[in-house]
Amino acid sequence: MAQVAIFKEIFDQVRKDLNCELFYSELKRHNVSHYIYYLATDNIHIVLENDNTVLIKGLKKVVNVKFSRNTHLIETSYDRLKSREITFQQYRENLAKAGVFRWITNIHEHKRYYYTFDNSLLFTESIQNTTQIFPR
């Protein structure tokens, strides 16, 4: 249970202050290999380097993920979130409209992979030198 509280705090903090450098540093310090974020439920599945897992259950309302695919909406929504024109909840809803069911962020590869309901890869982005917003 202590790990869940630690990771929840890390994810909450990055949403608040957008300090992604600190976010990645903390994830690496806690031996996170990658995490999977499920847009529909707001759940986060964290996979550690030793293959142990931690689940953070989402507290937000469930959103409906569309079957349409819109990579442009993914990019523009991110830009609007970064400039604080929209909230994380609105960002999440926009990604669901764009057809994103889940994303996987690989900490060591510095990549985020967006997937649809049928597990098709929809979009890939580098997270190395960018300011990103992360779930929770």
From Swiss-Prot:
Recorded coiled-coil stretches: none
Gene3D superfamilies named among the record's database cross-references: YdfO-like (3.30.1810.10)
InterPro entries xrefs: DUF1398 (IPR009833), YdfO-like_sf (IPR036696)
Entry superkingdom: Bacteria
Family under the similarity heading: To E.coli YcgX and YdfO.
Any further remark recorded for this protein: Encoded by the cryptic lambdoid prophage DLP12.
Name of the protein in question: Uncharacterized protein YbcV
Species in which this protein is naturally found: Escherichia coli (strain K12)
Lineage: Bacteria, Pseudomonadati, Pseudomonadota, Gammaproteobacteria, Enterobacterales
Gene: ybcV
